[in-house]
Amino acid sequence: MAATCEISNIFSNYFSAMYSSEDSTLASVPPAATFGADDLVLTLSNPQMSLEGTEKASWLGEQPQFWSKTQVLDWISYQVEKNKYDASAIDFSRCDMDGATLCNCALEELRLVFGPLGDQLHAQLRDLTSSSSDELSWIIELLEKDGMAFQEALDPGPFDQGSPFAQELLDDGQQASPYHPGSCGAGAPSPGSSDVSTAGTGASRSSHSSDSGGSDVDLDPTDGKLFPSDGFRDCKKGDPKHGKRKRGRPRKLSKEYWDCLEGKKSKHAPRGTHLWEFIRDILIHPELNEGLMKWENRHEGVFKFLRSEAVAQLWGQKKKNSNMTYEKLSRAMRYYYKREILERVDGRRLVYKFGKNSSGWKEEEVLQSRN
C-alpha cells in the first residue's frame, strides 16, 4: 500500500513544457493525500484534470542513465499520460529501478513490464540517450572553442593570429643576428632562439604607459646624428623642427639605408633575426644607429628609443610588414620579459633594459667579437 501511494505521489509531478506541441492535454495530479491507493488507476486514466499546479518533471535535464528511482517513476508516469495508456496493465512492482537499470533493459523486458507501452518507452529512451550524447559533444566542442578564444584574449601581442611576430617567435631554428660578427657563422645558440613553448603564456603582462608608446618623442639635438638626408630629407641638423616630429605615418626609409643597416649576409647565415637582437645590433653599431636609439646606461644595459616609429618601420621592413608600429613592436618586446632577455624600466617612457639572459651588448663582448 505504501509503495502504491508513493507511485501515486510521483505521478502528480507532470511537466509538459518540453513536449508542449503534443502534450497540451497533459494534466497534473492532486497530491497523494487527497486520494487512496484504489484511486491510482482512476487518476492515471483521467487526463482531463486541471493543468494548474503542474510542476517541472524531475527527470528533465539529466541523462537517463543517471536518473534516480524517483525520476524513473516520474518519467514512466509522464509516458502513461502522454500515450493515454491504461495504467492497470502495468506491473508496478517491477518499476522499482534506477536510470542505469532502465537503460539496460532490452525491448523484450520493457514489453513484459509495460505491455504495448514498452515499445514506446524503448524508443523514447533511445532518443533521449542519443540526444544527450549529441548535446554533450556539442557543449564540449563549444567550451573548447571558447577556451581557445579566451586564451587568445588573455595573451595578446606576438601570439595573435596573423601577428607579424608569430613566425619570428615560433621559429624552431636557432637564428643568429646578421649584424653581430660573433653570430654570423654556423652560429652559437642565441638566448632568444629557444622554442617559444617553454615560455608559457606569461609573456603578455599588462601594458604599462611606457610600453604603449607613440611616435612623438622629444629628441635632444646632442643625442647623436639624425637620419641621412635621403631617408628623412627635412630632418637636418640645425633645423628647428627636427626636435619633435609631427604626427602621422613615419617617413619611408630609403632602400640604401636599409641595405646599409642590414649588411652583407653570409650565404650560410640563418634567415631573419630575433627582435631583441635587432634592437641590440642597432645600439652596438653607432655608425648605423643614426639617432634611432641611445644608451642610457651602457654598463647596466639600459637603453632608450629616440625614434620609436622609425625603429618599428625598420623592423616592419625586415619582416615585410608595412603596417608595423611602435605599439605593436613594444607588445612583441613584452614576450622577452618572461625569459629575462629584456626588462621594462618602470616610470620611464620608451626606456628598457637588457636582462640577464641577453648577450652581445656589453662593451667587452663587442670588442671580443671584433677581434
Curated annotation (Swiss-Prot):
Pfam families: Ets (PF00178), SAM_PNT (PF02198)
Triggers of expression: Transcriptionally regulated by ERBB2 receptor signaling in breast cancer epithelial cells. Up-regulated by phorbol 12-myristate 13-acetate (PMA) in bronchial epithelial cells. By retinoic acid in MCF-7 mammary epithelial cells (at protein level).
InterPro entries: Elf-3_PNT, Ets_dom, ETS_fam, Pointed_dom, SAM/pointed_sf, WH-like_DNA-bd_sf, WH_DNA-bd_sf
Annotated GO MF terms: DNA-binding transcription activator activity, RNA polymerase II-specific; DNA-binding transcription factor activity; DNA-binding transcription factor activity, RNA polymerase II-specific; RNA polymerase II cis-regulatory region sequence-specific DNA binding; sequence-specific double-stranded DNA binding
Effect of K319A: Partially abrogates repressive effect on the KRT4 promoter
Domain of life: Eukaryota
GO CC, one annotated term: Golgi apparatus
Region feature (Disordered): 173-251
Compositional bias ranges of the Basic residues kind: 242-251
Keyword Ribonucleoprotein: no
Domain PNT: 46-132
Keyword field: Activator, Cytoplasm, Developmental protein, Differentiation, DNA-binding, Inflammatory response, Nucleus, Repressor, Transcription, Transcription regulation
Motif 9aaTAD, residue range(s) on this chain: 137-145
Primary location: cytoplasm
Domain notes: The 9aaTAD motif is a transactivation domain present in a large number of yeast and animal transcription factors.
Role played: Transcriptional activator that binds and transactivates ETS sequences containing the consensus nucleotide core sequence GGA[AT]. Acts synergistically with POU2F3 to transactivate the SPRR2A promoter and with RUNX1 to transactivate the ANGPT1 promoter. Also transactivates collagenase, CCL20, CLND7, FLG, KRT8, NOS2, PTGS2, SPRR2B, TGFBR2 and TGM3 promoters. Represses KRT4 promoter activity. Involved in mediating vascular inflammation. May play an important role in epithelial cell differentiation and tumorigenesis. May be a critical downstream effector of the ERBB2 signaling pathway.
Record note on quaternary structure: Interacts with TBP. Interacts with CREBBP and EP300; these act as transcriptional coactivators of ELF3 and positively modulate its function. Interacts with XRCC5/KU86 and XRCC6/KU70; these inhibit the ability of ELF3 to bind DNA and negatively modulate its transcriptional activity. Associated with CLND7 and POU2F3. Interacts with ZNF768.
Protein name: ETS-related transcription factor Elf-3
Species of origin: Homo sapiens
High-level lineage: Eukaryota, Metazoa, Chordata, Craniata, Vertebrata
